[in-house]
Swiss-Prot record:
The keyword Secreted applies. It comes from the Eukaryota. The lineage of its organism: Eukaryota, Metazoa, Chordata, Craniata, Vertebrata. InterPro entries: Chemokine_b/g/d, Chemokine_CC_CS, Chemokine_IL8-like_dom, Interleukin_8-like_sf. This is C-C motif chemokine 3. Disulfide bonds join 34-58, 35-74. Its main location: secreted.
């Protein structure tokens, strides 16, 4: 009887571990930041410190600007001002 209870406990623990592994996201390419909406108006160039583009795995393309105060703001990559800021940041990097 003790053997059956011990075997059942081991089986339950193994099942719990397996379910956690399979429910976790696969791969290291899981996007960490995606844009679901964009800023409504142009940011002041003076407050923008850096940028990065969202992953291609995100549902919408986006550019995330990092402000000098550490805030992250999503912008539409097709807008002219966004492309100008990216060019300026690249040239001054």
């Amino acid at each position: 009887m003790k053997v059956a209870v011990a075997a059942l406990a081991v089986l339950l623990c193994a099942m719990a571990l397996c379910s956690q592994v399979f429910s976790a996201p696969f791969g290291a390419d899981t996007p960490t930041a995606c844009c679901f909406s964009y800023v409504a108006r142009q940011l002041s160039r003076k407050i923008v410190a850096d940028y990065f583009e969202t992953s291609s795995q995100c549902s919408k393309p986006g550019v995330i600007f990092q402000t000098k105060k550490g805030r992250q703001v999503c912008a539409n990559p097709t807008e002219d001002w966004v492309q100008e800021y990216i060019t300026d940041l690249e040239l001054n990097a």
